[in-house]
Design a protein with these regions (language model features):
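Short acidic/glycine- and proline-prone juxtamembrane loop motifs at membrane-interface regions
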Residues: 32, 158-165
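Specific aromatic-rich, kink-prone transmembrane helix
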Residues: 125, 129, 165-182, 191-196
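Transmembrane signal-anchor helices characteristic of membrane glycosylation enzymes that use polyprenol
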Residues: 7-35, 43-73, 146, 199, ...
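Short helix- or helix-capping micro-motifs
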Residues: 140-148, 175, 196, 200
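Transmembrane-helix signature of polytopic, membrane-embedded enzymes
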Residues: 12, 124-149, 182, 186-187, ...
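Transmembrane-helix motifs of polytopic, lipid-linked glycan transferases
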Residues: 109, 113-134, 172, 176
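Transmembrane-lumen/periplasm boundary regions of multi-pass, lipid-linked membrane glycan transferases
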Residues: 48-51, 81-90, 100-103, 198-200, ...
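Transmembrane-embedded, aromatic-rich helix segments that form part
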Residues: 190-192, 205-220
């Protein structure tokens, strides 16, 4: 019991200090050209959503933000590079509109902090994932420290709103995949499918998540001769595709052809 309390104190202190450092230093990082591209993409898709659902009270303000990018002629046109996932870019573009953010530096500073928060949450989940896998506090603690303080990952965790978001949702997905194999429940499959769908729209590599789960569920079915896994496989496929479609405007008009195009372009 004493060891358990000591371990809790260590991990709470560690994650508390990590959060404090992130809060103090998130605005110390520069801005890459890709961040401007994602900013443009977010406003473009927000404008699409606002018009698709006829949200009249936002139309003018969103269009004003979109038109401001006419000055950035060197940025990739989101009408052509229209397959970037929306999970980070669209909500932050909506924040810009709602709070009428005009200061350019603030655009990126709060985005850096949100990217860090995603990574911070993923590091907590990663610790619990290792704890489930190894059932050893020291291995889990040092494994998490390596995950966090890998120089490239740590630096990117404040500004890379594609790869860090992907990494975070991969961790979330794998955590729930482990939970599924502990004891299959519909809620776990739905959460896995949601996170895997977001990972896929962020980067095409996220496709390996549902494919891997389906393969392992099928292998488990062969091992125990049970037919129950078939319904869970079908649920995983259906819910994954549904979440992919629902959260990704790129797929709304022609889901199949757009998804094939996404794979071919990536």
């Amino acid at each position: 019991m004493e060891t358990k309390n000591k371990n809790k104190l260590i991990i709470y202190t560690f994650f508390g200090f990590f959060l404090l450092v992130g809060f103090i230093t998130y605005d110390d990082y520069g801005v890459s050209i890709e961040e401007h591209t994602q900013l443009y993409s977010g406003v473009y898709w927000l404008n699409y959503i606002v018009n698709f659902f006829e949200i009249d009270f936002l139309k003018e303000r969103v269009l004003q933000n979109l038109n401001s990018f006419a000055y950035y002629s060197d940025l990739p046109d989101p009408r052509i590079y229209n397959y970037y996932g929306p999970i980070f870019d669209v909500p932050t573009a909506l924040i810009d509109v709602i709070f009428n953010i005009q200061k350019t530096s603030l655009y990126f500073q709060y985005r850096h902090f949100i990217v860090f928060l995603f990574f911070y949450l993923s590091s907590i989940v990663f610790f619990h994932l290792l704890l489930k896998r190894f059932d050893n506090f020291l291995i889990s603690f040092f494994g998490t420290a390596m995950y966090i303080f890998s120089p490239r990952i740590y630096g990117d965790s404040f500004h890379n709103n594609k790869d860090i978001i992907l990494l975070s949702f991969v961790v979330f997905s794998i955590f729930f995949a482990f939970k599924i194999f502990e004891k299959i429940k519909i809620k776990k499959i739905l959460l896995f499918s949601l996170f895997a769908a977001i990972a896929t729209s962020t980067r095409v590599m996220g496709l390996f998540l549902p494919i891997s789960l389906i393969i392992f569920l099928y292998l488990e079915k062969l091992n125990d001769k049970s037919t129950s896994n078939i319904k869970y496989i079908l649920l995983a496929i259906f819910s994954y595709l549904l979440f992919l479609f629902l959260h990704w405007p790129y797929l709304w008009e022609s889901p199949i052809s757009s998804f094939i195009e996404f794979i071919s372009k990536s």
